[in-house]
Every structure is written in structure tokens, then in C-alpha cells.
């Protein structure tokens, strides 16, 4: 392998991974926009859609290690394509929703598919393809792309709902999701990189056992649990709250978009601070400020 090829492979994987997270994160964080219109169409309370959204997120958590294992065994590209296909099917299904079973089933399927084209598969591919000296920066770039996807896609989807209606907008989003298939092939280059050939093999069971023996892993998992609860709660219910306050529909979309863009800024800034200050103290500060924000 030539020197230029070695340098090109990580770049292609980063581009592909960034595009995947940009689209998948944008789709995932837009579901709160559908809470009111879908609930009104089904003539149900908001509890049904909220419950389905909770299952959506739960399936992302359950599916992530499963797709991670598939990625290790069959390659990141193949694993992500499977996830993308599930996402496309779920969006078609949700566009034609007719009752409780279809709304719960479509969101559950979407969550499972999102795990396949989400952080577990993408970050694993990027981590394998880049040199250890550039790994943190590369992972930060890809994660920032995901948050940027929330910034550009959520308000765009809110306009689609206003113009075409919620059902047809989901139909259009299924075509947007299909674009991810192109970028999933970029992840296959991670298997050809020199970095991916180093290290020892480890089964999924062995990896899980080793992780849960680590105090830092358990504490970090609890932190992500709290973070996920906050972010999902806001993403699902903020647009409905905005509507209840008689504000224009687009305000909810742009409110979620601002969360995405400031997440990009915060990720970069606190990543910078994390190399210079105590990460534990920074996390405590972040969660403390978030708690105060909810009280206000």
C-alpha cells in the first residue's frame, strides 16, 4: 500500500462516518416534531407516541453492542447497510401508521436501525482507521458532524411537515435515509487500514465482562444514562410544549437545531478544556449547570 493510499483511507472513513452520523442524528432528533400531528391523527393522547419514542431510544441502546459485534465480524460497511435498511423500512411504516401497533413497531424498528448506522459502528470504524495520535480529533470531528446534522435537518424537517404534512414528509425522509447507503461503503476502507490490523481479538462477552469490572465505565454509563434521559425528554416534548404555548411550529424545530449547534461548540470547547483540566470536575460542572437549567 502506497503512502498516499494510507493517508487517503482514514480521510474516506471520516467523511463516510461524518455523513452517516449527520443524517442519522438529524433523523433521530426530529421525531419530537411528529408528536402532536401523529397523536392528533390517531386520536390518542400523547402518551402513546411518547412511549413509542422511549422504546425507540431503548432499542438504540440494546442494538448498539449487537451491531458493534456484527461490525467486528462482518465489517462496518455491511453492519451499517443493515441498519440503514431498517431505518428506511421504519420510516415507510411510520408514514402509513394506522394504530398503536404500527406506531410502536415503526419506532422500535427505527431505534434498532439507528443503532446500526450510529455511533457504535461509525466510531469503531473511524477508531480503527486512524493513527492513535489523531484518534481523539478524528472521533471529535465525526461526533460534531452528528450534532451539525441536528442543526440543519431538524428545522428542515419542520418545514417539510408544514408544507407537505407529516405523513408525506416521512415518505420523503425515507429517501433521504437511503443516501446513507452510499456513505456506508466508505466504512469498508477501515478494514484495509494498517491501524485495524493491530490489537488482540476479544469476544463480545469478554468485552462486556471487562467493561463492567471497571468503576470508571460504570460511572460513565450512569452519566450517559442521565444525559440520554435529558436529551431525549427535550427532543420529544419541546416541540409540543412550543405548540401548547401558541408559538409557530417552526420555533420548535429551530429550538432543537440550536441545541445541536451549541453541542458542536460545547464538544470542541470542553474537549479543549479536557486536555488541561480535570475531566471529572468538568463533567460535574456540566451536569450541575444542566440541573439548574431545568429548574429555571
What are the functions of these language-model segments?
Residues 78-92, 281-295:
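Structural signature of the two symmetry-related core transmembrane helices
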Residues 108-144:
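Cytoplasmic helix-loop-helix junction between adjacent transmembrane helices
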Residues 90, 101-109:
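Paired small-residue
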Residues 188-206:
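Flexible cytoplasmic inter-helical loops of multi-pass small-molecule transporters
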Residues 63-75, 267-278:
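Helix-to-loop junctions at the C-terminal end of transmembrane segments
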Residues 31-35, 215-270:
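Extracytoplasmic gate region of multi-pass secondary transporters
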Residues 29, 57-65, 150-151, 260-268:
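Residue-level signature of mid-helix packing/kink "hotspots" within the transmembrane helices
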Residues 142-190:
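Helix-loop-helix hairpin linking two adjacent transmembrane segments in secondary transporters
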Amino acid at each position: 500500500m502506497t503512502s498516499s493510499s494510507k493517508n487517503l483511507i482514514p480521510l474516506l472513513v471520516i467523511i463516510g462516518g461524518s455523513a452517516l452520523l449527520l443524517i442519522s442524528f438529524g433523523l433521530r432528533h426530529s421525531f419530537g416534531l411528529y408528536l402532536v400531528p401523529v397523536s392528533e391523527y390517531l386520536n390518542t393522547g400523547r402518551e402513546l407516541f411518547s412511549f413509542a419514542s422511549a422504546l425507540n431510544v431503548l432499542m438504540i441502546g440494546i442494538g448498539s453492542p449487537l451491531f458493534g459485534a456484527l461490525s467486528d465480524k462482518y465489517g462496518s460497511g455491511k453492519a451499517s447497510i443493515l441498519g440503514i435498511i431498517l431505518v428506511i423500512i421504519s420510516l415507510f411504516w411510520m408514514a402509513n401508521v394506522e394504530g398503536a401497533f404500527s406506531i410502536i413497531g415503526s419506532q422500535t424498528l427505527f431505534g434498532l436501525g439507528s443503532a446500526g448506522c450510529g455511533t457504535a459502528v461509525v466510531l469503531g470504524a473511524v477508531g480503527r482507521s486512524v493513527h492513535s495520535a489523531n484518534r481523539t480529533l478524528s472521533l471529535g470531528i465525526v461526533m460534531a458532524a452528528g450534532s451539525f446534522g441536528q442543526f440543519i435537518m431538524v428545522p428542515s424537517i419542520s418545514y417539510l411537515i408544514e408544507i407537505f404534512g407529516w405523513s408525506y414528509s416521512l415518505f420523503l425522509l425515507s429517501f433521504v435515509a437511503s443516501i446513507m447507503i452510499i456513505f456506508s461503503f466508505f466504512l469498508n476502507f477501515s478494514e484495509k487500514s494498517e491501524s485495524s490490523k493491530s490489537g488482540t481479538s476479544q469476544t463480545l462477552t469478554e468485552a462486556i465482562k471487562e467493561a463492567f469490572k471497571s468503576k470508571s465505565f460504570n460511572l460513565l454509563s450512569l452519566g450517559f444514562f442521565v444525559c440520554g434521559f435529558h436529551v431525549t425528554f427535550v427532543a420529544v416534548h419541546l416541540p409540543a410544549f412550543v405548540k401548547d404555548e401558541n408559538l409557530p411550529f417552526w420555533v420548535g424545530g429551530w429550538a432543537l437545531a440550536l441545541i445541536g449547534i451549541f453541542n458542536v461548540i460545547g464538544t470542541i470547547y470542553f474537549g479543549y478544556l479536557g486536555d488541561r483540566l480535570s475531566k471529572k470536575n468538568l463533567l460535574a460542572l456540566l451536569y450541575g449547570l444542566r440541573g439548574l437549567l431545568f429548574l429555571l
